[in-house]
């Protein structure tokens, strides 16, 4: 990272300078990802009844925000260079770019295998930006070395910025939805209610359905179920939980059984 930054200023290659700044954020992102993953293993307590699982999501949000800020800065610098192209030293840029490409490729492949975790996914996007930065540095140096095309450096940097914008948007969108207790992607509350009424003969009505995610791969749900036979309450709860787990992969649900009428007259409803 330090070597690449120094090389960027010496060679005047924007892709190297941008990549060095991105690598600095990567170091912070990976450290934050590791710290939040360790912290999320702690059990619950009286103040945090769900434990520290959301730390992974919060870390992903911070990582996504840093990606967005970096993409904005890279875009600005690229526009300045496009308006007034500056020469670079192609050979040192090529060497540093090849070294960075190899290192970042190894790290990205390692992180990409754990992409189901939102926090690790956001960290992998940071490294992907570094990988693309190294590749862009190689192309820019070759273009200047053989053709003298000074516009290639800021142009390729702009492409990287656009890719980072897309990655930042995805991570921020997913993490914000989880932090706001939004309905998990792919969940249809109407379908859940209808499935429960169709498959559980004891159920007369399903309402007050609320679904959210504790983390990116841990959905949770609460609902009210109206039944006609109070003696079958335990059976109904077990049946509903089994259906939720089998049909929708929800293994943590809270079911409130009602005989007639709902005691909650106000609030957010899902009928």
Regions found by a protein language model. Name each.
Residues 1-3:
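The first (N-terminal) embedded transmembrane alpha-helix
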